[in-house]
Design a protein with these regions (language model features):
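Short helix-capping/linker turns of helical repeat alpha-solenoids
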Residues: 16-18, 31-33, 52-54, 67-69, ...
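Hydrophobic face of amphipathic alpha-helices that form TPR/SEL1-like repeat modules
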Residues: 24-31, 60-67, 96-103, 132-139, ...
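Primarily low-complexity, compositionally biased regions used by nucleic-acid-associated proteins
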Residues: 167-203
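Intrinsically disordered, low-complexity polybasic segments
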Residues: 200-221
Length: 238
């Protein structure tokens, strides 16, 4: 690859307003390809292409504003450019904007918007979005806690060798094991309670039956009253 020649040709085309050339030249200035790094010039070139609607340039410009590359950090501008690229279906922009909604960078926290954007990015296989959305499901942010879905998403990211996802997956797996143990313990406790209640009811029934039997037996075996018969004559004979 002849980066020097590519940089020269891109510069000539970019000066004529060619959107792809502006984007490429911005990339080359950003990474020092074909010459020295020039971060302010990279920001300028990406800005020109972004204004013409180039989604890749919009993402790059959003990131430069986010980290303060080639100029000051500006979360509001970062969020704006990510938003424009995300609206074009750019997966990285959707993931980055989703995370900004989670942390309230460049605007208020909005978990609902974050879940929606991250979901769109996940559908395109974006690993960062898989991790972030997995964490949201685990923490119950923007919806109910769903450890099963959290694990599924983190495993998708792990399959792409996403850095750091293993630690998050260990936490989720541990929580899943603890939840299953608790559910088993709760089920066992409930069963024990039901058995105890059933045993108690049986004891009460047996005691009541025994008491009734005692009452019935006493009535049938009691001796008749021994009232002496009266004599029809006078006194007893001598």
């Amino acid at each position: 690859k002849d980066y020097v020649e590519a940089r020269r040709l891109s510069g000539a085309a970019a000066a004529k307003g060619h959107i792809e050339a502006q984007t490429l030249l911005g990339h080359m200035h950003l990474h020092g390809e074909g010459g020295e790094k020039d971060l302010p010039e990279a920001r300028k070139m990406h800005g020109l292409a972004a204004l013409q609607g180039h989604a890749g340039a919009q993402v790059a410009l959003g990131t430069m504003h986010f980290i303060g590359s080639g100029g000051p950090i500006d979360f509001t501008e970062s969020r704006r450019w990510y938003g424009l690229a995300a609206a074009q279906g750019q997966a990285d922009a959707q993931a980055n904007l989703g995370q900004m909604h989670v942390y309230g960078q460049g605007g208020p926290i909005n978990y609902g918007a974050a879940r929606r954007l991250l979901g769109l990015s996940v559908a395109q296989g974006q690993a960062d979005a898989q991790v972030m959305l997995g964490k949201m499901h685990f923490n119950g942010e923007g919806g109910p806690t769903d450890v099963v879905e959290a694990r599924r998403l983190l495993e998708l990211a792990a399959a792409q060798d996403h850095a750091g996802v293993r630690a998050a997956l260990e936490v989720v797996n541990k929580a899943s094991d603890e939840r299953r143990a608790k559910e088993t313990s709760d089920a066992d406790a409930m069963m024990a309670l039901l058995l105890a209640e059933d045993t108690e009811e049986k004891k009460k029934g047996a005691a009541k039956s025994k008491k009734n039997k005692k009452k019935g037996g006493a009535k049938s075996t009691s001796p008749p009253s021994a009232t002496p018969p009266t004599s029809g004559g006078g006194g007893a004979s001598a």
